[in-house]
């Protein structure tokens, strides 16, 4: 196959990823961002990492699983930089959820405030669980067993409950 064909195939696959998975990428970045600037930076980092590693996708898992893994790893890697800039207003305070009732909006803001306090791996687990991702797929994304996924999610939910009662 010619270099031109490989390049065309790579670009087509990347365009497809961007078109189909932008909401997923945005959701993961939102969970790790502390400000709107961090959110935008994370999205750019994720897209750059997807572009550079797209040739490494070998169909051993679903495309969405691979994208989640790249997104989460990128966000965790960048979280130290974001913590240094924690004086910014939190993203949950900056972004408005337009189509929600005031009560529901406040519940969502409180949930995101609590999730922001979790460590990066806990954030990834709870985000995937909230997204309705199957335990098997969460295990593939996080590199842990299905049983361990259940145990860790239970612990994170307990931790969030305790944090909300403080």
Residue locations for each model-derived region?
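C-terminal flanking helix
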Residues: 22, 26, 47, 119, ...
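Hydrophobic positions on the alpha-helical face of helix-turn-helix-like DNA-binding modules
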Residues: 46, 70, 125-126, 138-139, ...
């Amino acid at each position: 196959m010619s270099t031109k064909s490989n390049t065309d195939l790579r670009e087509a696959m990347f365009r497809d990823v961007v078109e189909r998975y932008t909401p997923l990428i945005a959701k993961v970045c939102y969970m790790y961002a502390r400000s709107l600037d961090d959110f935008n930076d994370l999205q750019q980092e994720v897209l750059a990492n997807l572009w550079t590693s797209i040739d490494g996708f070998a169909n051993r898992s679903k495309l969405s699983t691979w994208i989640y893994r790249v997104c989460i790893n990128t966000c965790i890697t960048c979280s130290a930089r974001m913590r240094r800039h924690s004086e910014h207003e939190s993203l949950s305070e900056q972004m408005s959820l337009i189509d929600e009732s005031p009560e529901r909006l406040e519940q969502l803001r409180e949930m995101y405030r609590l999730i922001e306090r979790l460590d990066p791996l806990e954030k990834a687990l709870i985000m995937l669980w909230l997204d309705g991702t199957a335990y098997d797929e969460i295990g593939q994304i996080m590199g842990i067993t299905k049983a361990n996924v259940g145990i860790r999610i239970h612990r994170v939910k307990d931790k969030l409950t305790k944090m909300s009662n403080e």
